[in-house]
């Protein structure tokens, strides 16, 4: 069974040489998202008593951009030994090939009711709201991410999550 280290190594290899929106190595974004999602999942489990494994959430968070931003596939994740729930969560978080509006993708993610995916997307959206990752003239991105974060937070709350 793959570990967090294995997920990190898989993501590091898959994203080798890639830079994020802020010009940093992609892995920094993935690590920030994974740490935030793991913290949220820990709250969900320990405080809210929800059936969620923070370590599995962290694995999925480290892998959340692999299918979207690299040639890797869900079959590659399965071949590497990642379990079905992790592959499903990563797949839910992956932008579809067809052009679908961001708000519709958030609606689809919310409708899936996958708490792990919601907490990871909250963490991803929160990281994307960081001023160093959004150009100063891109107020529309700040608005898009802020609106999505509130929708995701409300959906997580509907699942019983009481964290921020």
Language-model features: where?
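Active-site helical microenvironments for divalent-metal-assisted chemistry
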Residues: 1-164
């Amino acid at each position: 069974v793959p570990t967090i280290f294995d997920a990190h190594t898989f993501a590091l290899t898959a994203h080798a040489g890639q830079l994020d929106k802020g010009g940093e190595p992609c892995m920094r974004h993935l690590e920030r998202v994974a740490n935030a999602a793991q913290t949220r999942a820990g709250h969900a489990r320990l405080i809210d008593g929800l059936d969620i494994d923070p370590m599995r959430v962290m694995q999925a968070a480290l892998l959340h951009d692999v299918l979207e931003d690299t040639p890797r596939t869900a079959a590659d994740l399965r071949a590497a030994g990642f379990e079905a729930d992790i592959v499903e969560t990563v797949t839910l978080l992956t932008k579809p090939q067809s052009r679908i509006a961001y708000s519709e993708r958030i609606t689809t993610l919310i409708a899936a009711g996958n708490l792990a995916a919601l907490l990871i997307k909250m963490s991803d959206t929160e990281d994307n709201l960081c001023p160093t990752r959004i150009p100063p003239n891109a107020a529309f991105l700040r608005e898009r991410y802020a609106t999505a974060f509130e929708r995701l937070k409300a959906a997580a709350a509907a699942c019983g999550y009481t964290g921020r």
